[in-house]
Amino acid sequence: MLDGLKMEENFQSAIDTSASFSSLLGRAVSPKSVCEGCQRVILDRFLLRLNDSFWHEQCVQCASCKEPLETTCFYRDKKLYCKYDYEKLFAVKCGGCFEAIAPNEFVMRAQKSVYHLSCFCCCVCERQLQKGDEFVLKEGQLLCKGDYEKERELLSLVSPAASDSGKSDDEESLCKSAHGAGKGTAEEGKDHKRPKRPRTILTTQQRRAFKASFEVSSKPCRKVRETLAAETGLSVRVVQVWFQNQRAKMKKLARRQQQQQQDQQNTQRLSSAQTNGGGSAGMEGIMNPYTALPTPQQLLAIEQSVYSSDPFRQGLTPPQMPGDHMHPYGAEPLFHDLDSDDTSLSNLGDCFLATSEAGPLQSRVGNPIDHLYSMQNSYFTS
């Protein structure tokens, strides 16, 4: 009975001992680590620890040049880099020479761009800008105040429109150096002869690319200009100046064509006016020598005025009164030779026939032949 109890006690103590030992082992053994580089479980005897993450020895290498890292390394976006590649990829670069800027170098800042002291100069006259000088940051290039004003004057001469000669969408306003305190006075350098700007000569392919883009949009955005500059191998500034000159050229041609159309219209109007004026003047010259014929009312007035004193009707034989057959038309001795000579009748007839051709007015008033025959009949019947 005691032996059984001792065995049970020994068995129970053995179980407790094994449980406590397993608990100790569980605390001592750490969970398996995962490599930060390849995301695999680390089964190697030795490992490397970087920024609270575990790495295989073979995974600790530069992500750019694939060289193993032994002493120092740079960590960015869960990747490792050597010093050279890290500075090449992520270090601050100069806005002028696009080279990395060392941490111990002095710099000049213009808005978001950083420059070496030697690179902080005007791109036209290459004069180094000092503290307090006024300048313009245009298309990532620095322009001093004098060269900027000259460029605007040239653009205004080429293109008088305010839209072309004004600032572009990405052109910054006139500003001062970031390190300047107060408004400084820039050196004008009027006596100094500045070197002339090099003239850019476009090739056929570059000109075709520019014209194709100009047909799509005469005023492209900044991204399109940067794309054209990358395709043609030119600077963005050259691309912008070409588009400005092309817009000015098209406007000049449009104004010239409009002026020609106006001149042509004015010439046509003048010619038509001269034609109409000459025709009317010619007709007036033709009609002026001829007087207008009298109207029937005027003819009737003439009849009444001429024969208002005649008591007899027109074309009828006057009444035969005693002693009046010799002078039926008044007391005037118009036919005093009728009895002396018979041939005088024929002469009188010829005279009246000659006078009958005077015109339509006399024929309408009365024919003297009728009066002559009536007088002759009355003479022979009496």
Swiss-Prot record:
Q: Where in the cell is it found?
A: Nucleus
Q: Write out the coiled-coil annotation as residue ranges.
A: none
Q: Where is the composition biased (Low complexity)?
A: 256-269
Q: Which tissues show it?
A: Isoform 1 is expressed in many tissues. Not found in heart, liver, spleen and testis. Relatively highly expressed in fetal brain. Isoform LMX1A-4AB is expressed in testis.
CC terms in the record's Gene Ontology section: chromatin; nucleus
* Top-rank taxon, per record: Eukaryota
UniProt keyword annotations, A-Z: Activator, Deafness, Developmental protein, Disease variant, DNA-binding, Homeobox, LIM domain, Metal-binding, Non-syndromic deafness, Nucleus, Repeat, Transcription, Transcription regulation, Zinc
Task: Note whether Chloroplast occurs among the keywords.
Answer: no
Ranges where the record places region Disordered: 161-208, 252-285
Write down the SUPFAM superfamilies for this protein, in alphabetical order. Answer: Glucocorticoid receptor-like (DNA-binding domain), Homeodomain-like
GO BP term, pick one:
axon guidance
Primary location = nucleus
Outcome following mutation: C97S: In DFNA7; uncertain significance
Pfam families found in the cross-reference section: Homeodomain, LIM
Cited function: Acts as a transcriptional activator by binding to an A/T-rich sequence, the FLAT element, in the insulin gene promoter. Required for development of the roof plate and, in turn, for specification of dorsal cell fates in the CNS and developing vertebrae.
> What is the protein's given name?
LIM homeobox transcription factor 1-alpha
Question: Which taxonomic lineage does the organism of this UniProt entry have?
Answer: Eukaryota, Metazoa, Chordata, Craniata, Vertebrata
